């Protein structure tokens, strides 16, 4: 090795050991300082994230409940007592004409959830009758099944303007081909 190369290597080694502003080495701080910073900043960040989650999630659920006019169980029971004399078909017709958009649903049904979310996304606040929470659910569901074409699932059943629109397949087909919004406007469920 020549003396010149050796001198250059010694100079580079010496310069690396000196503190330099243009160094590509990571800044030299003690690990204790990093732990202290993490110890100070992490709990407030976790608290902020938790508070945001706690504040936002119930707000979204409450907003959804406010937009969707869910028929309360007590009101439904009053209606059931008053409608005991009527036939099941008259009762379904009365329930279906009570609002611009009415959805007969089951609380655990994923397709019912899809239909309700679609209508809410369009800006419609449907009246929702959860059949699994009604006392006369079996009679109402039997009447709805006779109104639907054979092979259709019993829920969801959507009425627009007091007239039967259909189940989830019909609602989605109308949405895709662009006829759902005009139907909702004609029924008075949408103003825009």
UniProtKB/Swiss-Prot annotation:
Main subcellular location of this protein, as a coarse class: cytoplasm
Gene3D superfamilies in the record: Glutaredoxin
ATP-binding in keyword set: no
Lineage: Eukaryota, Viridiplantae, Streptophyta, Embryophyta, Tracheophyta
UniProt motif (Responsive for interaction with TGA factors) ranges: 189-192
Entry function: Has a glutathione-disulfide oxidoreductase activity in the presence of NADPH and glutathione reductase. Reduces low molecular weight disulfides and proteins.
Protein name: Glutaredoxin-C9
Record domain Glutaredoxin: where: 89-191
Disulfide bond annotation, renumbered to this chain: 109-112
Keywords: Cytoplasm, Disulfide bond, Electron transport, Nucleus, Redox-active center, Transport
Family affiliation: Belongs to the glutaredoxin family. CC-type subfamily.
Record's subcellular location: Cytoplasm; Nucleus
GO CC field: cytoplasm; nucleus
Domain of life: Eukaryota
InterPro entries with a match to the protein in the record: GlrX-like_pln_2 (IPR011905), Glutaredoxin (IPR002109), Thioredoxin-like_sf (IPR036249)
